[in-house]
């Protein structure tokens, strides 16, 4: 049994024994209307005490105090882990955060399974709910998205691979999270979300989840087409990181969006792995490669290009990138050579 399966099975047992609120007393009346979740700049800061992959992070963390640290540094959306056994959270944490800071948009992050989970989340004060596509059927996912919206909450649908994209297409959620952490092994591959992002062929705001440790990671995510990030352990340990991440998704980081090098690079790698790429509303048609199987072919870069003819031949032979040397060298390229080969589909690196 995988870690994810253990967590879900434990949650089912708690629901059977204590109900969907898992013993937490819910407010008699919701005190604040739902706040828009993940508004730009979408830096979502997480509140968690531990995790299966990292163990103890901040065991004595006070949820409301941590939310205040994020809020003072400019964050307007927070994620509260309410899973007790593996992450050390509870619905009480979410209630405390929303009561202290009703203006914050709060995501309930848990392994939610049915409509009663959605209704309990709303009653506790959540403005958004995380729905993990791999735990649900396509029909269940669509139904839970609809229930969340009926209550005024934003569903954040979390995807982990091409199969999840296919499953989510029917619901076509407005807010999609792509997780760099494999929920079977809990290992992180920061390039993986950038390979999945091109498969989203409906109008959605995409959030990069897990593995964010600094501004460079956030700029990478923005360059790959993501509108925001969800950051957990790094923010818990260093709340000052919040301002750096907000900067990456503000005007100072706009260049990353305008020069989507990383998005294009990992889209090519996704194609090599057999991932279907974006189609004009007609779906993708196949699922291809899946995580855990060996990559059929690596990315190839040919360096030291000195002529347009060489660049064209490199592309014809399968190069994904061509490189130009502009420092003093026998292979120094003319300054205008990249412009001469701009119509080649391979990426250019100087």
Q: What are the language-model segments listed below?
A:
Residues 1-106, 113-115, 138, 147-175, ...:
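Conserved N-terminal beta1-alpha1 strand-loop-helix module at the mouth
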Residues 108-109, 131-132, 179, 208-209, ...:
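Thr-Gly-centered strand-to-loop micro-motif
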Residues 117-135, 141, 147:
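A short alpha/beta connector and helix-capping loop motif
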Residues 200-201, 342:
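Short, conserved loop/helix-junction motifs that constitute active-site signature segments
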């Amino acid at each position: 049994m995988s870690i994810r399966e253990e967590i879900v099975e434990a949650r089912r047992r708690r629901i059977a024994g204590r109900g969907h609120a898992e013993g937490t007393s819910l407010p008699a009346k919701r005190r604040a209307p739902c706040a828009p979740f993940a508004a730009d700049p979408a830096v979502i800061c997480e509140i968690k005490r531990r995790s299966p992959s990292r163990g103890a992070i901040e065991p004595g963390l006070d949820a409301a105090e941590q939310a205040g640290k994020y809020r003072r540094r400019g964050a307007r959306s927070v994620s509260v882990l309410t899973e007790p056994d593996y992450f050390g959270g509870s619905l009480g944490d979410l209630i405390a955060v929303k009561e202290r800071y009703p203006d914050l948009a709060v995501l309930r992050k848990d392994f939610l399974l049915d409509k009663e989970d959605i209704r309990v989340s709303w009653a506790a004060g959540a403005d958004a709910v995380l729905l993990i596509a791999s735990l649900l059927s396509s029909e269940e996912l669509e139904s839970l998205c609809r229930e969340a919206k009926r209550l005024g909450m934003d569903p954040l649908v979390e995807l982990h691979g091409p199969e999840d994209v296919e499953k989510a297409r029917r619901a076509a959620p407005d807010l999609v999270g792509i997780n760099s952490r494999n929920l079977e092994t809990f290992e992180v591959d920061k390039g993986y979300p950038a390979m999945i992002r091109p498969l989203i062929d409906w109008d959605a705001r995409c959030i990069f989840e897990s593995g964010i440790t600094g501004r460079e990671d956030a700029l990478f995510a923005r360059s790959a087409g993501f509108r925001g990030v969800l950051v957990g352990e790094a923010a818990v340990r260093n709340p000052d990181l919040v301002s750096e991440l907000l900067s990456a998704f503000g005007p100072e980081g706009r260049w990353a969006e305008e020069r989507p090098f990383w998005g294009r690079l990992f889209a090519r790698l996704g194609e090599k792995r057999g991932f279907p790429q974006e189609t004009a509303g007609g779906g993708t048609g196949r699922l291809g490669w899946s995580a855990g199987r060996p990559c059929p072919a690596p990315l190839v870069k040919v360096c030291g290009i000195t002529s347009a003819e060489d660049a064209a031949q490199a592309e014809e032979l399968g190069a994904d990138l061509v490189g130009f040397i502009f420092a003093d060298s026998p292979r120094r390229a003319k300054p205008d050579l990249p412009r001469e080969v701009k119509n080649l589909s391979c990426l250019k690196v100087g």
